[in-house]
Amino acid sequence: MISFTTRISRVTFSSKRVALPDGPSLHDFIETGNSNDAVEKYGIQMKLEANAKRLRLPPWLKRSIPSVDNTNFTHLKKQVKKLKLATVCEEARCPNIEECWSGSNNVPSTATIMLMGDTCTRGCKFCSVKTSLKPPPLNPEEPINTAKAIADWGINYVVLTSVDRDDIEDGGASHIAATVKHLKQECPNILVECLVPDFRGSLSSVETIASSGLDVYAHNMETVRRLTPWVRDPRATYDQSLKVLEYAKKFRADIVTKTSLMLGLGETDEEVLTTLHDLRKIGVDALTFGQYMQPTKRHLLVKEWITPEKFEEWREVGDXLGFLYTASGPLVRSSYKAGEYFLGKVVKNRKQGVQEN
C-alpha cells in the first residue's frame, strides 16, 4: 500500500519512495506542480486567481459541435425523443455525447439512460439537471419501455442512471430494479451498470438494486471529504456514499463496484489520495477521474484546469493502488464508454468463476 503522512498543509513521504510501474515515483508526482508547468507549456492560466471571473477553456477541452450529418447520432437522438426517454448525456450536457452516441470502429453506440424523470429532488452545485422538491410522479411504464428501447438499439452494455427522488419512500430503488429485470428479460446477455443515488443511506434500497440482476453497481463520490458539503447537496455526505458502496460489495461479493471523482474544484493531491485509500479499504473495483466543467454561470466556478499529463499520473496511481480499472482524463465521465468493454470482461470472468465454484 502507498502511504503518506500529513504535516499541516504539506504532503511528505517516508524515505522509502514507492515507484509506480514504468513511471515517476509518487513523491515526484506530488512534488510536480500541475499549474506552473502547464502555464509554461500551454500559455494559459491554470488556476483561478482572487477576484477572477472564470478561467479560459484550455485547448484540450475544446470539442466540435455534434454534426447533424452523423447518421447514428441523429437516429439515436430521434429515438430518445420519440420514446420520451431522458438521458444524462443530454441533461448533464456531457462533452462526450457525439462520440458515445455515434459509435466508431465497429463499436456500438452507447447512451446512458436517466430514469425517474428529468427533475431531481437535490440541488448539487455542479449539476445542471433540473431540481424540485416535488417532481412529477414516476411513469409506471418506464421500466418496460426503457427495456424495449434498449433492446432495439442492439447494444451489449448499458448504463442506467437516475435523478435523486427523496420524495419516494425507497428513493426509487424498486423502479430502477424493475428496469434492470425487464432489460435482462429482453436481452439476457446484456451487461447492465446502474449509476445510482445514495438513497439517503438506506441499506434496504441498496439491497434492492444489488439483487436486481445488475452487473456493475456505481455510485459517485464526486469529490473529496472537505469539499463534499460545498459541492454536493447537504443530504449527500462523504461517509454515506462510502457506506452504500461498501454495503453493495458486502451484499454481493461478485458485484463490480465503481465510483467517480471530479477534479478541478479546489481539492489537493493529498485529499485525493486519502479518498482513493478510503475507496480501496471498502473494496471499490473501478474508478474514473474527470475534469469538472461549469455547466452554467449559476454553478460552481472551475478552480483549476487539470492537464492531460496529470490525469495520466492519477491513472497510474489508481492502478498502483489496486483498482481493477482506472479511467482518467479531462473528458472522462463516470459513464464514459471507454471502460465499458474492460468492465464487461471483468463481469464475465467473475460470473464464470462463480459458476465454476
UniProtKB/Swiss-Prot annotation:
Q: Which compartments is it annotated to reside in?
A: Mitochondrion
The protein's superkingdom reads Eukaryota
Q: Known EC number(s)?
A: 2.8.1.8
Q: Which positions are annotated as binding [4Fe-4S] cluster 2? A: 120, 124, 127
Domain Radical SAM core: start-end pairs: 105-324
Keywords annotated in UniProt:
4Fe-4S, Iron, Iron-sulfur, Metal-binding, Mitochondrion, S-adenosyl-L-methionine, Transferase
- Its principal location? mitochondrion
GO molecular function, one example? lipoate synthase activity
Q: Which SMART domains match?
A: Elp3 (SM00729)
Q: Which InterPro entries match?
A: Aldolase_TIM (IPR013785), Elp3/MiaA/NifB-like_rSAM (IPR006638), LIAS_N (IPR031691), Lipoyl_synth (IPR003698), rSAM (IPR007197)
Which one Pfam family would you cite for this protein?
Radical_SAM
Cellular component, GO, one term = mitochondrion
Miscellaneous notes: This protein may be expected to contain an N-terminal transit peptide but none has been predicted.
Q: Which NCBIfam families match?
A: lipA, PRK05481.1, PRK12928.1
Q: Which PANTHER family match?
A: LIPOYL SYNTHASE, LIPOYL SYNTHASE, MITOCHONDRIAL
Instruction: Describe the family membership recorded for this protein in Swiss-Prot or TrEMBL.
Output: Belongs to the radical SAM superfamily. Lipoyl synthase family.
The protein depicted here goes by the name: Lipoyl synthase, mitochondrial
Q: What is the scientific name of the source organism?
A: Brugia malayi (Filarial nematode worm)
